Each structure stands twice: as C-alpha cells, then as structure tokens.
Amino acid sequence: MKTLVTAVLFLCSACVLAAGNGVKVPPFERLQLPNGTVVLLMERHDVPLIAFSAVLRGGAVSDPAGGSGVASLLAGLLQKGAGQRDAVQFAETVASVGGQIEAAASTESISVSGSFLARDQQLMVELVADMLQRPRLEQEQFDTLRARQIEFIRAAKESDLAALAPIYGESHLFGAHPYGRPVDGSEASLAAIKHADLQRYYQEQVGADRLIISVAGDFKSAQLQQRISSAFSGWRKAGTPLQQLPQAERVASRNVLLIDAPESVQSYFWAGNVAVAKKDPRRPSLDVTNTLFGGRFTSMLNTELRIRTGLSYNASSHFDRLQQPGNWEMSSFTQTETTIQALDLMLATLDQLHESGLEPALVESGKSYVQGQYPLALETSEQWAAQLATLEFYGLDRRYIDDYSAQLGGVTSADAKKVIDEVIPPSTALSIVVIGNAAAIRDGLRKYGPITEMKLADPTFAPVRAE
C-alpha cells in the first residue's frame, strides 16, 4: 500500500459517548493518494450499509465571470451518463441494487453523495469513479438540463419568492465578490453558458487534487483503501490552481434593493451583512446567540413577527459560514400592507438584541436546545461521511466536534453579548432586500436607505453587474 498512497495515515480514536458527555468522533483513517486525493474511512458495523461523500473544491466561486451556474450544471450532468453507461443505464444500475447517488453544487464545492449495501462497495467505487473521471457531458443532456434549470427559476418567480429572497440578498450584499454568484445561475447567465464552457470548467476545475472522498459504514478499511486507490490514483490533477478568495467587505450603512413583483400580495424581505468564516473560534457563542435570536420557533424574531403580532408565519436568522467570512442574515414575509410594520419590527428586535443582550436564563435555554439538537446530526453513516468531508474541506481537526459540547456548556451571557457586539450587525449596517409590489411599498422603504430597483421579470439577480 505504501507504493499507492502517501504515508499520511491517521488513526483517530474515541467513540460516541453518552449524550451528557457530548459527541466524540469515532475512529477513522485518513490517507492521501500521490495525486492529492484525500480519502477518509470510518468503519461502522451497526448496519450492512456504506455511505460516501465525495467533495470537489471549487463550486460556484470557480464559475467564470458572467457564467454563474456552470458548476451547478456540471453537478447535474455527472449522473446523466458516465463511463460505459448512458443516463438511463447509469440510473438503472444504481436502482437495481437499491443504491442512492446524488450530485449537487454549492458556493465552494461540487459534491457527490449516496449509499449502497455493503456487498455492493465495489460497484459504488466504480460508479463514483466514472462520474468524476469519465462523465459523458453530452450536448443533448446539457441542453435539456440548462432549459430545465431556467424553468425552475421562472417557476420560483411565480410561486416561491421566499426561496429567491436570499439569492437576491447574497448577490446584493457581496456584489462582485464570488460569494455573490447565484449557485444555480440566473436566467441570463444560464442562457449564455455554452456546452464548451462546461467542458472547459471540467478540465480546469475538476481533478484529483481537488477531491476528498469520505466513506462511513460496514466495510474493512484495508480492502476499501485498495479499491479506492486503484480507481483514483491514476486520475489527473485539475488544470488550474484553486482560486484563493479575498475577504468580502462588510457594509457600513444601510442600503435597499427593491425587486418589483407587481402581482404579489405579500412582501418578502431579507437583511444581512458579512459575518464569520467556518473556522471562527467563537462558534459555540454564535450558535447559542443565533438560536435565541432567530434559530428556533420561540426565538426573538419569530416570537415578535409570528407569535405576538401575527405579521408573518415565520421569521428566522442564520449564519452561512464558508472558507472566508460568509453572511449572517434574517428574513421573513408579510402582507403587502404590513410590509413596513413588519420590517420595522424586525429591525427593532435586532436593536433590542444589541441593547439588552441575552439574560443568563435565556442563554441556558439556548445552550440546552443546541446541546439537544447537535447529536441528532451525527448519528448515521451518511451524516458521518458528510461530516468527515466537511472537517477536511475546511481544515478543521476532530476537536471541532469533540470539544463542542464542553464549549457550549461554558457559554455565558457575557460571551453572547461579546459576539453580538463583534459579529451580529447593528440595524444601521445592513443590506436589505425586499421583493414585493414596489408601487405600494416604495415610499415606506425610503427611510431605510438609498434604494436600488429592479423587476422580478429581469433575468438576473443583480441590477447591473454580470453574474
């Protein structure tokens, strides 16, 4: 095996402890192939299943300028024929053994994940290797998928404006920074993408040195190492180096993007700013604080906008933590006639958080909630395969999981106030996006800051710049 892999083999110990002691990372092995591919293997023999997560660094941030959606299209095409199998044969092969495979793009990666019976591990490795190394990327399949993706966006503009608000929001907040690119593209950017653009992306942005393969389940590590090494050690590296991204700048004042949806009887609003990266050490305090402000049903935001006033059916906030600082955002929706009232209340609730902080009893409640939810995300082989890939992707070690419960237990009201002051933006420094009937709400929105307008019918998610 030493001739096949670099001698970077880690045997990690400990197991999942009782809930009161928190979650610990079970034993797993890490190895790196000579071409740069990282392989993570965690044996779990509770059920005869194997789950995998194969992650390629890159994603939407590596889309060409003006070509947002290329990574997403590539992810969609990985299952539409690979190796000796066309799209139908590939799907039938997976289904015939009761397996599951799906591919998706995100801001910073393209991932392929799935699960198979333990007896089918050789087929699993073969299919994943074909998808990544030998995708067919046929013109006809490309044309069909691109047209379908454009239709999905148009359908969302007719029936799911809530799903579009954060896309407009992040595009508005990050501007020309790659984090502002819509992962699935826009009507305009998708229409401009050619088949050759997708092939070029595959050659330049996909390769062994970008790949993390994480597997958890019922297998013998030595045997699976050999199979993965045989299937992937000969793969080429990506044609270009991985782009190193700069930090995005926080907005220092308020500004508004108004998207005119004249037929809508509701307004959908989003507000956010640049916040923290995945590796930020204040994670426990941030998680507790956000949970209490907008991360659970009884949060401050939802209590004010739904439970107490009935202005909305839902109001929430969350962090998007990436390699570089991503965004913190809050969002909700309401009837057109109560748009300004609801937005005022959302901003006032944020002011309350900054002015009063969080009382110790409330912090204890938030800690208990997060402590109870966290283990539920680390129970199955599918979850562990994904989690190991995430740790590797962001350069995090096992302490990110092992120490989390104890760190949560130590969060105080003072810690919460510190991250509120340092990370959560004040109501005076927000990018605000509102989708709604502009004629009915434009004048009321003027008090929040300078307004930039566009139409829902516009084929982009930004008013001027190329996506």
Residue spans for each PLM region:
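Positively charged n-region of N-terminal signal peptides that target proteins for export
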Residues: 1-5
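An aromatic/glycine/proline-enriched structural segment found at the starts
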Residues: 21, 175, 212-277, 434-467
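Short, surface-exposed beta-strand/loop micro-motifs that present aromatic residues
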Residues: 29-30, 38-43, 199-204, 253-261, ...
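Peptidyl-prolyl cis-trans isomerase
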Residues: 134-142, 193
